[in-house]
Amino acid sequence: MSNNSLLIKNANIVDGTGTEAFIGDVLVEDGVIKNVGNIDGEFETVIDANGLILAPGFIDIHTHFDPQLCWDGYATPSIEHGVTTVVTGNCSLSLAPIRN
């Protein structure tokens, strides 16, 4: 068993490549995806994701978070919906502070 290991089993995996989703497992060790497929072994944490979808973080290219980022720098509502990256200032106005 690896320390800091997480196995997500039986997930409906959408890998972001455009291929069909498939049922499989994802092994994460020390916060890094190490393997995707049918994985056996003992792991620190095992999550049975049967009936659930597992996908990479989504990118939201059109947001109006500019002012919100001044008080919520993590864009918390997006994280709660699977969005890990946002683009701001794409409406020709950005209220977010800009630093060198």
Feature roles, as predicted:
Residues 53-77:
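Di-metal (Zn2+ and/or Mg2+/Mn2+) metal-binding site signature of metallo-dependent hydrolases
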Residues 8, 45-47, 87:
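Hydrophobic/aromatic beta-strand patches that form the interior of the parallel beta-sheet core
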Residues 17, 37, 67-69, 87:
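Activation segment
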Residues 40-57:
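Active-site metal-binding motif and surrounding structural segment of the metallo-beta-lactamase
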Residues 15, 66, 93-97:
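Flexible loop/turn segments at secondary-structure boundaries
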Residues 71-100:
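Divalent-metal coordination cores built from histidine and acidic residues
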Residues 1-42:
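N-terminal metal-binding scaffold of metallo-dependent hydrolase/deaminase domains
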